[in-house]
């Protein structure tokens, strides 16, 4: 959609070679300012056709987040309703099939055109709101440049060695097995499942007679904090072994998740979330690279 009131909706399958080149040049032109909702995702989609998008002056997703960071949902229809008081009909309301789209369903295309118009209207509204909140400079000088930096980071990925990850997985599995054996030896019973909170309660509070921890729905707490307090109080080797087992298993699980996330290019392509936390920091998902425990030497 253009500020002049023109809209165009098309599928790339309808473009002839000349049109495709022209569209690619228009998308890449930094002098032509563009507003999008979720520019990072759009850039990923366009990159699949070797297109680059330049001149993005407003990402309404990011702008809405800066104004109301505590919201749980920033999809386009919710953002339009939140900031403009307009309820848009979903483009796929009525569960349109690919056949409907292929048959040029007018309602579907009109809905997409309407949404394109509202991207521009929303961008204008959010520009005023950013000014009112004193966040215009933050938006243009930090958040908007960061959008495409994150897109490139996600696209390029993080190079890893699958062999090294498999070696780590094996090492942590062996550490966990060793800790499990030490736990069994310390109480003279190799039938106890130290991964079972219920069986841990029986060993700690009934068999070893330790003071009971905080009451829970399933008995008494056996979380890490509770076990560490018991270890400080009693110093029993069973507790040390259980804590060591848990630490090793957590690292093994983390490494297994990383192995599963490695792509054919031997890189991990995580998603960096710019609009999730209320504090403004980045988060990472699929996989969560911020969930790697680094407080211990093994974690590091």
How would you name each of these model-derived features?
Residues 1-14, 71, 98-299:
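Conserved "right-hand" nucleotidyltransferase catalytic core of DNA-directed polymerases
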Residues 1-131, 169:
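Conserved DEDDh/DEDDy metal-dependent 3′-5′ exonuclease domain
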């Amino acid at each position: 959609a253009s500020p002049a009131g023109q809209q165009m909706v098309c599928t790339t399958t309808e473009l002839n070679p000349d049109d495709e080149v022209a569209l690619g040049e228009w998308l890449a032109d930094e002098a032509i300012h563009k507003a999008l909702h979720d520019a990072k995702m759009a850039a990923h989609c366009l990159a699949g056709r070797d297109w680059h998008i330049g001149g993005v002056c407003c990402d309404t997703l990011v702008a809405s987040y800066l104004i109301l960071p505590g919201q749980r949902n920033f999809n386009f229809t919710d953002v339009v309703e939140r900031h403009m008081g307009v309820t848009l009909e979903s483009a796929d309301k009525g569960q349109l099939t690919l056949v409907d789209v292929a048959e040029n369903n007018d309602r579907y295309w009109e809905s997409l055109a309407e949404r394109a118009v509202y991207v521009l209207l929303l961008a204008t509204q959010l520009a005023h709101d950013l000014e009112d909140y004193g966040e215009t400079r933050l938006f243009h000088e930090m958040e908007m440049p960061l959008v495409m930096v994150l897109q490139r980071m996600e696209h390029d990925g993080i190079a890893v060695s699958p062999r090294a990850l498999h070696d780590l997985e094996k090492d942590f599995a062996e550490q966990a097995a060793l800790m499990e054996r030490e736990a069994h030896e310390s109480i003279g019973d190799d039938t106890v499942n130290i991964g079972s909170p219920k069986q841990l309660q029986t060993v700690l509070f009934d068999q070893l007679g330790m003071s009971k921890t905080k009451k829970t729905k399933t008995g008494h707490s056996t979380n890490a904090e509770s076990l560490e307090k018991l270890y400080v109080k009693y110093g029993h080797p069973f507790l040390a072994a259980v804590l060591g087992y848990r630490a090793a298993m957590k690292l093994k699980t983390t490494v297994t998740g990383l192995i599963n996330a490695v792509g054919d290019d031997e890189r991990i392509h995580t998603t960096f979330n710019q609009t999730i936390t209320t504090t403004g920091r980045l988060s990472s998902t699929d996989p969560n690279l911020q969930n790697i425990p680094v407080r211990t030497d093994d974690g590091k």
